[in-house]
């Protein structure tokens, strides 16, 4: 039996649509068939790209992480901005995105963690990688701010925790 040729464009479309569906419907509310219908891919072809729904969602989380890096890194590489200005710009962008989604979509990783955090090992590892990625970048930015004098040194741990959880907290508040 000849295996169907894998198209990177189809895989990217599946990842994109899956990310949209997961953000809107959560893990358990997202059906593979609906995603395949939107992308116009036969159901049997899904397994040419992904071994399982868990592998698929873990790759979506990885893609989400890459998108976060693409947002974060250019902001932090602006040498003319202070660390505090960069943090303000970053959070303004995230809040604008949240408002543009009519407060219906928060952090994909936060939403998935609440729904399937401990039950899907591959997804849990991908989510932890995302969290570590954000925490590392925020810690670096805060340390830069402390060197510049725009962030007080004694606030380090408090600021790190608060900034990291601030966006997720807004999303959780929406759900309650």
Summary of predicted features, one role per range:
Residues 59, 73-104, 157-163:
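Hydrophobic alpha-helical connector segments
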Residues 24-28, 105, 148:
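Short coil/turn segments at alpha/beta junctions that flank glycine-rich nucleotide-binding fingerprints
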Residues 69, 73, 85-89, 118-147:
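Amphipathic alpha-helical packing segments from all-alpha helical-bundle domains
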Residues 13, 21-59:
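Helix-turn-helix
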Residues 109, 122-132, 146-176:
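Hydrophobic/aromatic-rich alpha-helical bundle segments in the mid-to-C-terminal region
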Residues 1-9:
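N-terminal intrinsically disordered/low-complexity leader segments
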Residues 10-19, 35, 60, 64, ...:
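Generic hydrophobic, amphipathic alpha-helix propensity
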Residues 86, 101-122:
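Amphipathic alpha-helical segments used for helix-helix packing
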């Amino acid at each position: 039996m000849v295996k169907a040729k894998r198209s990177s464009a189809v895989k990217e479309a599946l990842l994109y649509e899956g990310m949209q569906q997961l953000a809107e419907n959560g893990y358990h509310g997202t059906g593979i068939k609906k995603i395949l219908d939107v992308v116009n891919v036969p159901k049997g072809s899904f397994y040419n790209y992904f071994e399982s729904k868990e592998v698929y969602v873990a790759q979506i989380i990885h893609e989400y992480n890459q998108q976060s890096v693409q947002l974060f890194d250019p902001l932090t590489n602006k040498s003319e901005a202070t660390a505090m200005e960069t943090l303000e710009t970053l959070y303004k962008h995230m809040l604008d995105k949240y408002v543009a989604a009519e407060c219906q979509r928060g952090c994909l990783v936060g939403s998935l963690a609440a729904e399937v955090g401990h039950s899907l090992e591959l997804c849990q590892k991908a989510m932890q990688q995302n969290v570590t990625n954000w925490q590392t970048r925020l810690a670096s930015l805060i340390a830069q701010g402390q060197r510049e004098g725009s962030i007080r040194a004694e606030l380090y741990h408090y600021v790190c925790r608060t900034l990291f959880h601030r966006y997720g907290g807004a999303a959780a508040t929406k759900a309650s």
